Amino acid sequence: MDPEAFAVVGLRTMGGLEELFEAYGIRYLTASRIAEMGFTANTLLDMKEEELDDMMNSLSHIFRWDLLVGERYGIKAAIRAERRRLLEADDRRHHLHSTDHALLDALSHQGLSEEQVVQHSEKDQLGRAGSGDTAGTSWGAQQQRKKHRHRHHITAMKGAATEEDEEDEEEVEEMRRQREHPFIVTEPGEVARGKKNGLDYLFHLYDQCRDFLLQVQSLAKERGEKCPTKVTNQVFRYAKKAGASYINKPKMRHYVHCYALHCLDEHASNALRKSFKERGENVGAWRQACYHPLVTIAGRRAGWDIDAIFNAHPRLCIWYVPTKLRQLCHAHRHSSASAASSASTSTSAPTAHHLELPY
């Protein structure tokens, strides 16, 4: 293909990224990598700060792309500038629209006011000829009322705009609360496309947490402080200060049992991922399905003592056992003990009856 034609095709498939990053020192190859991941300029503009960090970390860790420090800041700066430009353009359009409506409203009120002035002037001249009231006085009063109505109209428009902004903010906040973590079910080695990340990336976050824990332990030893042995709030705060704001306590605690299955039985974990991917299940259903294999492993290896299994594993010993997983193991232990007790009772009862029989 001709180089110029190739460049034209490249521009068409960039999704507006080259224009977005043009003045911010982002390499063309970096922009093309981001486009290969399925992102466009509009997609990036709609993403939150944490999601942008996730995207850049996926680019670095999963795609093994050497993302420069300046490019990280340049991407965010370009997005902020474009958002600001779009917002200013919307404000200008809104201002012109409001001004036109206010002008038309004022003209309509002015026409009505003039008619009322003529009517009042005629009545004053007929009914109050000697009272000293003049048409000029009536005109001044009407002008005052007209100004008052105009001010009231402008105030009402501003109030309506403020209420709409507040409702929009409430809707955005509600969407943020309802929004689940940005993961989709992927097979091992599969790279997720779009705004959501795959499960390989999720498991990689747990390895990153382990690295942050080691750094916190090293700093604590240098300062003579108590070293944490598990991933605690101190580790999450350290990760946030280090720039890894995409690592947070709710997200990591939510999927820790899925990571445990990945560590204890990678073959079973991969089979489960493949099955749910083929059926088109979402990540919430896959997360729930990860409990049962773990309970089975706990019953087979340690008599349902899931804490012992976590503590004996080098990658799991730094994580707290989820309460639900512990409760499930306890329930299975109890039901198994009850079943064994019932079986023992039913087996021993006929023997006792046989001994009572006379010979």
UniProtKB/Swiss-Prot annotation:
The record marks K226, N233, R237, G284 as: Interaction with DNA. Residues 144-155 have a biased composition (Basic residues). Expressed strongly in the early floral primordium and then successively in the primordia of sepals, petals, stamens and carpels. Also in the leaf primordia and young leaves. InterPro entries: FLO/LFY_C, FLO_LFY, Floricaula/leafy_C_sf, LFY_SAM. GO terms for biological process: regulation of DNA-templated transcription. The lineage of its organism: Eukaryota, Viridiplantae, Streptophyta, Embryophyta, Tracheophyta. PANTHER family: PROTEIN LEAFY. Probable transcription factor. One of its GO terms (molecular function) is DNA binding. Its main location: nucleus. GO terms for cellular component: nucleus. It comes from Eucalyptus globulus (Tasmanian blue gum). Residues 179-183, 248-255, 320-323 bind DNA. Residues 340-352 have a biased composition (Low complexity). Residues 113-170, 340-359 are annotated as: Disordered. The keyword DNA-binding applies. Keywords: Activator, Developmental protein, DNA-binding, Nucleus, Transcription, Transcription regulation. Belongs to the FLO/LFY family. The keyword DNA-binding applies. This is Leafy/floricaula homolog FL1.
